[in-house]
Amino acid sequence: MKPGDLVIARAAKVKRRNPPNAIMLYDWKTTGYLPWKNGNLGMIIELDPKTEGAIVMADGNVGWVSQVIIEVIDESG
């Protein structure tokens, strides 16, 4: 996983009783959350090793998301 990689949101990997129908990107500017639908593509802008998260651009939004709920798209076919 590195900046520039295309990733897909995987809500199923979140260990919750009622997984949300959207991944929430944390917007540090407004301290709010932006929706990112399960299965939609995004691109890693920067990795954040301290929090085990990534800054991702997805669905027209940019925010932080846990690396646990994203999966790199294998472009090799």
List each model region and its residues.
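Basic/aromatic-rich interaction segments and small domains that mediate binding to polyanionic partners
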Residues: K2-G77
